[in-house]
Amino acid sequence: MRSDKYSQLVSVVNAGLGACGTSATLVYIRNNARVAPTGDIITLPARLDGPPIPAEYILEAMTSLLSIRTAWLRIQNTGQAVIVAGCSTQNFHHGDVTWEPPASTVTLTTAKSLWVSASAVREMKVIQRIRTAPLAAMMFMCFYRGGKNEVTVRFAFYKSDSEPNLLKISKCVYEAIDAEATRNLPKPRGFDTPPCAVLAQRMRPLGAAEGGDRETSAQTHSPAAQAQHVMQHATATKSWGALGRTLKHKKNLGWILFTCALSLAAAFVTAYIK
């Protein structure tokens, strides 16, 4: 069966969950063909007291690949485990809670769900005066045990390591997309890349996205090569910048040496003529 946008979504999300000890799976399969669902699209089990989950990354992947206006994450406390589901719409039930900034922690009782939207993430960035560009500083979710089977959900933005994290995650995503494209190459209709290109544009590091001094071509470079080119370009830019600063500081010394050499040459010519 040809890979569709939902299979691509799972590949991209799992590439970002590689360090979280969990993986996402598709929910809706009907007549061996995945269709656009109205409820949960993907689900993944979360580890209590475990590594944080990149919530904003999952939301942006759903928004880009599925072309939906607002993506939602539903965090459900089953009493035995925590299940995170990606949804295209909010199916609010009695007792559910919607995350509203600026709250950084939410406590969930048994059989209750917490809804997190992509728009709420952007609102939280505005409140905390964080750059609102997608994935400029990724929002993560951590889950901790509480009393009486309660679960505490904590939201945090990691700013200091955002650029290295983006490079690592985007490289994993690009490799997953390349591998998927290679597997589907012999098939007549090929691999549907435009949504992935949108996600790649969203995940491009800030220095490359705002520089405007180069253009990348998807027809001549693979996405993995683009990520490597970005890192090489950043290193070269820093090296040339350091060289320029060194030459600027030594400009006056160069003029002094040039003047001395000219004086010595004039004295030598005068002595030779005499």
Curated annotation (Swiss-Prot):
Record topological domains on the Nuclear side: 274
Topological category with respect to the lipid bilayer: Single-pass membrane protein
InterPro entries noted in UniProt: Herpesvirus_viron_egress-type
Perinuclear space side: 1-252
Residues passing through the membrane, by range: 253-273
Gene Ontology CC annotations of this record: host cell nuclear inner membrane; membrane
Localization annotation: Host nucleus inner membrane
UniProt entry keywords in alphabetical sequence: Host membrane, Host nucleus, Late protein, Membrane, Phosphoprotein, Transmembrane, Transmembrane helix
Modification after translation, per record: Phosphorylated.
Domain of life: Viruses
Function in brief: Plays an essential role in virion nuclear egress, the first step of virion release from infected cell. Within the host nucleus, NEC1 interacts with the newly formed capsid through the vertexes and directs it to the inner nuclear membrane by associating with NEC2. Induces the budding of the capsid at the inner nuclear membrane as well as its envelopment into the perinuclear space.
Subunit field text: Forms a heterohexameric complex with NEC1.
Family: Belongs to the herpesviridae NEC2 protein family.
Protein known as: Nuclear egress protein 2
Species: Psittacid herpesvirus 1 (isolate Amazon parrot/-/97-0001/1997)
